[in-house]
Amino acid sequence: MTGDNTLIHSHGINRRDFMKLCAALAATMGLSSKAAAEMAESVTNPQRPPVIWIGAQECTGCTESLLRATHPTVENLVLETISLEYHEVLSAAFGHQVEENKHNALEKYKGQYVLVVDGSIPLKDNGIYCMVAGEPIVDHIRKAAEGAAAIIAIGSCSAWGGVAAAGVNPTGAVSLLSLIHISEPTRP
């Protein structure tokens, strides 16, 4: 075990007991003995997971909620918990540069990043009702979903289609779940 062990030691747990605990947890979950070492490593050397946040037909309410959160604050979240690789609204870059940053993050962290999507996804007329960099947002989301380790639909629009999918639904808005055809959502 390397790294900062102060959290573990502050609770009166020494290295040996901690490794025993990890081994017991791995055995309880039916995992290999190697998993115990991996658990210990991930606890003592936490890495900030890369996050790619794509907004579709949205009001930016989910981003506003994130910015106004008090625990954790957006500063703590972005500087200590996650590595926010792409968020069109919060990015310092714009135009071609922000799209290049997103493309680079998709390639660099393929299979490792968490994809967060807010907003419903318009499918009518080939998705022309929500375009980013000259392409329908649906294409951006499908491409990002292919390489994601995990996908999170944030807010009612992304989770259920929201207001845009209600009633007349002129843009053919759908939820993220409908778009990527996951049969059953996984809840923490």
Give the ranges of each region predicted by the language model.
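Twin-arginine (Tat) signal peptide motif
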Residues: S10-D17, T186
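N-terminal export signals
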Residues: D17-M39
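Extended, subdomain-level signal for the structured scaffold at the beginning of enzyme domains
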Residues: M19, E38-I141
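Residue-level detector of conserved catalytic or cofactor/ligand-binding positions
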Residues: S178-P188
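A short alpha->loop->secondary-structure connector
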Residues: G167-L179
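Short, conserved loop/helix-junction motifs that constitute active-site signature segments
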Residues: K143-A148
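N-terminal secretory signal peptides
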Residues: M1-I13
